[in-house]
Amino acid sequence: MFAQYSNRREFLKSGGLSLILLLNSCSNVSKKVNFALQNSFLPDSFKDIIPFAWKQNKINFGSNNLEKNRNIILDSDFTLINDGWISTINFSQFNEINESYFSEILDRRSKDFLNSFEVNQRNKLFPIGLVPYAIIIKNNKDLVSSARKSWNFLLSRKLTKKIIFPESPRVLISIAEKINSSDALAKLKSQAMLFDDQNILNWLINSEACVAIVPYSLCSKYLKIDPRLSIVFPKQGVPLIWYFVLSRSNLSSEILIDWIKSLESKSTVDKLSSEGWYIPFNTNYIQSKYKAEMHHNLGPSKLCWDNSWSFPQLTNAQKIKFENYWNNLLIP
């Protein structure tokens, strides 16, 4: 054994180097992965597929404590964020993750949406989830048929002051553009009972409200326990919410790839889609989830998906314009 070494000192030196490499390797494997996310808006099925060994660092993009969010993100290997909050992210702090595996697995819809971002941004964003908005109707089966056809039903006199809208100017304006009526946005405002994102379904269940527009991923548990509620996806399409993973990690990219691969299993795809979370990957089974027949009660139909829309990033000037427009809209 000693023959390949010229002396005892060289042997010990070589052995010490091997030990250091072994310890470094073990350290990299055992290092806990830190994952920053706002889990209050995630379905249980998604929370369940996050590896148990990963430490979940909770953030709140809706809070005023942005500095705390930044510190948590800087201390995390990966961050989950939706497209509504991407403007709060400093992309220079993240790594590119556009490896061949990631570019090959994405479907056409996700690639098209990524192309709406600047190059330095799109190369650091990996789409991992797509959530459609849904219409939830309470105690009014007659509305379901008209709601399936178009968004025009929102202007019904029966719904005056009985609709709960998301607190998002872009969502509301985009819906108004689908309604066949002059001054549709002002008319929608007159139909609103309130605007809310946090407790929208609690308001619907426990008030005189009849309709709520809410991300599908927040609906499933309420639909199971309250028979008064019906879910509808208009064939005109619905607004879409995108979720992305960003990486700051010095760990092997295989850690992220292995987790991404786990999302492709049929059982995982079934669980996620049943709770309103769709994987934007280009596999036959995943794509079948986007091809449901019309009047399918477990998600949007193919026609609805084809007509649905995403929101490209706003410039600072556009953002200020939307904020001012929204604030003026809320003034009685």
Where are these regions (language model features)?
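N-terminal secretory signal peptides and thylakoid transit peptides that target proteins
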Residues: 2-19
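Early extracytoplasmic/lumenal segment of secretory-pathway proteins
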Residues: 27-91
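A structural signal for short loop-to-beta-strand junctions that line the ligand-binding cleft
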Residues: 76-78, 94-135
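Ligand-binding pocket segment of bilobal, Venus flytrap-like solute-binding proteins
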Residues: 83-89, 164-236
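Short beta-strand->loop
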Residues: 97-108, 125, 227-239, 248-250
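A bilobed periplasmic-binding-protein/Venus flytrap-type ligand-binding module shared by bacterial periplasmic
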Residues: 134-142, 240-256, 262-263, 271-272, ...
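Flexible hinge/capping segments at coil-to-helix
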Residues: 143-159
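Extracellular/periplasmic juxtamembrane helices and adjacent flexible linkers that interface
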Residues: 254, 262-332
